[in-house]
Amino acid sequence: MVASVLVGLMSLFSLVAPGETPRPTLDFRLQDHRGAVHTLDEARDQKVVVLAFIGIECPLAESYAPRLADFARDFGKRGVAFYGVDSNQQDGPVAIGRFADKHKLPFPVLKDVGNTLADRLGAERTPEVFVLDASRAVVYRGRIDDQYAIGIHRPSSTKRDLVDALEAVLAGRPVAMPKTETVGCKIGRVTKPVETGAVTYARDVARILQSHCVTCHRPGEIAPFSLTDYRQAAGWSSMIAEVVDEGRMPPWHASPEHGKFANDARLSAVEKKAIRDWVAAGSPEGNPADLPPPPKFVEGWQIPRPDMVLEMPRDIEIPAEGSMPYELVEIDPKLTHDVWVGASQVRPGNPAVVHHVVVFVLPPGVDKIDEEGGDFLAAYAPGMPPRVLPEGVAKRIPAGSKIMLQLHYTPRGTKQIDRSRLGLVFTDPAKVHKELMSGMTLNLRLQIPPGASDYVSRADFRFSQPSLLLSVLPHMHLRGKSMKFVAEYPDGRSEVILDVPRYEFDWQNLYTLDQPKPMPEGTILHTEAHFDNSSENPNNPDPSRVVTFGEQTRDEMHVGYLNFTLADQDLALGAPTSKRLANGQYEVTFQYHPEAPAKSVALVGTFTDWKEHPVAMSGPDAQGNYATTVTLDSGSHEYKFLVDGDSFRHDPGNPEFNGFFHNSLIRLP
């Protein structure tokens, strides 16, 4: 157990500017996670001391821990002593020890109980480093380098601030840049709460966190820390207030000016104010009797027990640092018949490093994801719920299909492995009325010039039949700036379906409309994407190259995924029925029920030269159905129903389609 801490200051100190005489500063007496006491005086024989403030659950501290370990080993040979300092009230000694062991830190990590040392130094965030020269004056404070920041993952650093400061001090030169801005997690300081705050954790804040945060911020999930109890929430309270005020959390990037979404993650103005008031009052706990019941989470699968679980056939290795290209993993489910999927869930094998997963169906004859092949099936991203389709709606996977997983990983400071899984819940085909269909707007001709800061790309999708739009998902890579989905209706109207003005590659959101939106036949869904290939984009892997379409992160994509159903489809009506004749031909019976009363209905298709030789259908009967029977050869036949001589309609009871115009298809062996 960490004992009380004494931090003795010989004098208050300030940062030394170039040319100033360093002033004596401090000594401290702090315990590490093992209970060993350390003082600054123990480094009296060292030329330089580095105090690195870290938080064991801060993602940036995780990213920089291996680098600090390397620096400590390299500069330790030259007379530089490193100390880690953890001032977070929520970080205990056992957890600090696990962090130090995981990252193989060759220096002690000291527990700054009561954040006394952090207060004296003015440390605000983690990771933040302080460099003390031989007289133990602070000659540099700030970031380690510029590779990582909030929403920034450069391939490598362009400024090596800590290294430059150490080299200058060791060479006897003034530090050229004695202070840099630190980004990262706010230190979880101990505060003195107001005795009776108007807003308390127990009565108010716990409910907000349960509704919006703890799905991810709980043990075993993607978030780097938990927010399931008061101690954790209080330790992160100032950081919570910051990310809420800045709109970074909960992650939601749709403009509020357009569209309504069932999975809108935003906090209300009342909820935001409650968090601000709570933090301003010192984060009071309140009466534990006011706490809401703890939320119940399904352990493991969050969908009903899967009928099929597909596991990646191999482990994926994730490096400790840097970035890694997309991984494409193909799985053969060995389907001998069509299956209908009513619910699906991607379960990351290692949630800490799985950035996102997109799952596609590759029907027989399709071996890659492009505008001709690859059907969207499922997705995973932090905070994205499992896909549970409405009653009567299901996704069909044809027999013989393969499953393709597109995975993106984020290194987290240590080497890791992942083997993710996909769970599928099947639906009885007899209960399926509508097939979930997928489409995409796709620009394969991207040619983003070097240095272009606002390259515009456009792509469209045309609804060839009356449809109901359910959800959309914008996808770009590191140069993506924004994407907008606009529906252009046949009557000349246009409507913004989704506007993402600030696209973030770190968050792959599926935007589910609160109600299915009708897309009349002929509606064109336009997507306009903007890209920044300039050096001003900190995530840009290489602003000097022409960027084209490609699956790897260094390349770019302009993809607008969309999920929809056909408005008049009712698979319960059934597909055409057939009977094999003695001569090898088939007698096929077609039925059709028009949406509105019709004067006439005819059967047309490849076997009638379409409108050249239409087959009149008899009807309507008492139920309003039209029917006809024709004789066809074996093979595949496309067809539609011609209503009143000028309106082509697909077969609402047949899930098989073919071609750009989604002609209904019947296969006769």
Residue ranges and their predicted role:
Residues 62-103, 110-120:
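Structural microenvironment flanking redox-active thiols in thiol-disulfide oxidoreductases
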Residues 112-188:
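Thiol/selenol-based redox catalytic cores and closely related redox-interacting motifs
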Residues 251-261, 290-468, 474-571:
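Beta-strand-centric surfaces of beta-sandwich/beta-rich domains
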